[in-house]
From Swiss-Prot:
HAMAP family the record matches: QueA
Pfam family, one: Queuosine_synth
Enzyme class: transferase
GO molecular function: S-adenosylmethionine:tRNA ribosyltransferase-isomerase activity
Pathway involvement of the protein, from the record: tRNA modification; tRNA-queuosine biosynthesis
Protein name from the UniProt record: S-adenosylmethionine:tRNA ribosyltransferase-isomerase
Taxonomic source organism: Legionella pneumophila subsp. pneumophila (strain Philadelphia 1 / ATCC 33152 / DSM 7513)
SUPFAM superfamilies: QueA-like (SSF111337)
TM annotation in the entry: none
NCBIfam families, per database record: PRK00147.1 (NF001140), queA (TIGR00113)
EC code(s) of this entry: 2.4.99.17
Keyword set includes Lipoprotein: no
GO biological process, one term: queuosine biosynthetic process
Length: 337
């Protein structure tokens, strides 16, 4: 298949620039693969469409304030986006500067703090902080809003560009399907008899990398670190053995589960994955998916197409556009069953 097979015309005013006042005020478009029927609801109603014994798998990765601003000794401006923390003081980062940096260069931050460039690694730079990097980011870092949100980060983003169940720091972009869940929705889901388990996948900046190849099969996915625990494997196997559904909350949770089952059986693991899911892929674990509405020609639209069918995906997205759903990270959600 070609990249343009996944193109759709999205009016710019449908790209959500801010979150709604309340997380669960988001709209919810539900699609059933068996009946090919869909319906329009509010996200707070989602428990009504889940069944006792269903297992929701959520990504508990926490967004870090990964964007830093500084300057070189010459005064030239430098912008960093932390891609991955590799140690207490070391990290890999994308760096924007008027002139490329080299080993041993220093980057000066506010409050008298500084970073040292250790070496270049492909498109990234290995750097060392003057203190614990997470502490430094919490002091000086900015929330790394996606490129399609055309504004600077604000104080509200520290709370709202984060799931209420985020626990493991490491993502530079939110697992956005989880942004709609608030405590009331989680309580209603548990009261329904639905089980919840967690995976961890640290979302990298590569999630926004466009597909440049005409043939989608030629696209090389970015790599991200994920962990599937023994407890999660046990929960998934228990649900499957009872004939219950495993529903991934977000494409990151789905990609983690499918990566851990590449050998045919879900096994505990903690490693990198660059799994690319597009039409023709045979799903091994996931029976349902909760996900936002994604960019045209993106790998995430290709994943949704693999899950519900290409024509069905394009029709569903056109329905969302016609009904004025809000798109992308701060937008509305879909439940695909």
């Amino acid at each position: 298949m070609n990249k343009q097979d996944f193109y759709f015309d999205l009016p710019s005013e449908l790209i959500a620039q801010y979150p709604l006042a309340n997380r669960s005020d988001s709209r919810l478009l539900i699609y059933n693969r068996q009946t090919e029927e869909y319906g329009h609801y509010q996200f707070r109603e989602i428990a009504d469409f889940l069944q006792p014994g269903d297992l929701l798998v959520m990504n508990d990765s926490k967004v870090i304030p990964a964007r830093l601003y500084g300057h070189k000794a010459t005064g030239g401006k430098v912008e960093l986006l932390v891609e991955r923390i590799t140690g207490d003081f070391t990290f890999l980062a994308h760096i924007k500067a008027s002139k490329s940096l080299k080993s041993n260069d220093l980057i000066y931050l506010d409050a008298g703090k500084r970073l040292e460039v250790l070496q270049r690694q492909d498109d990234l730079f290995l750097c060392k902080a003057c203190e614990n990097i997470l502490d430094l980011l919490n002091d000086l870092g900015h929330i790394p809003l996606p490129p399609y949100i055309a504004r600077e980060d604000e104080s509200l983003d520290k709370e709202r560009y984060q799931t209420v169940y985020a626990k493991c720091a490491g993502s530079v972009a939110a697992p956005t399907a989880g942004l709609h869940f608030d405590d009331a929705v989680l309580s209603s889901i548990r009261a329904r008899g639905v089980n919840i388990a967690y995976v961890t996948l640290h979302v990298g900046a590569g999630t926004f990398r466009p597909v440049r190849c005409e043939r989608i099969q030629d696209h090389k996915m970015h790599s991200e670190w994920f962990t599937v625990s023994p407890d999660l494997c046990t929960a998934v196997k228990a649900a499957k053995s009872m004939g219950n559904r495993v529903i991934a909350v977000g494409t990151t949770a789905l990609r983690s589960l499918e990566s851990a089952a590449m050998g045919g059986e879900l096994i505990p693991c903690s490693r990198d994955t660059d799994i690319f899911i597009y039409p023709g892929y045979q799903f091994k674990v996931c029976d349902g998916l909760i996900t936002n509405f994604h960019l045209p020609e993106s790998t995430l639209v290709m994943l949704v197409s693999a899950f519900i069918g290409h024509q069905e995906c394009m029709a569903l997205y056109q329905e969302a556009i016609d009904k004025r759903y809000r798109f992308f990270s701060y937008g509305d959600a879909s439940l695909l069953l």
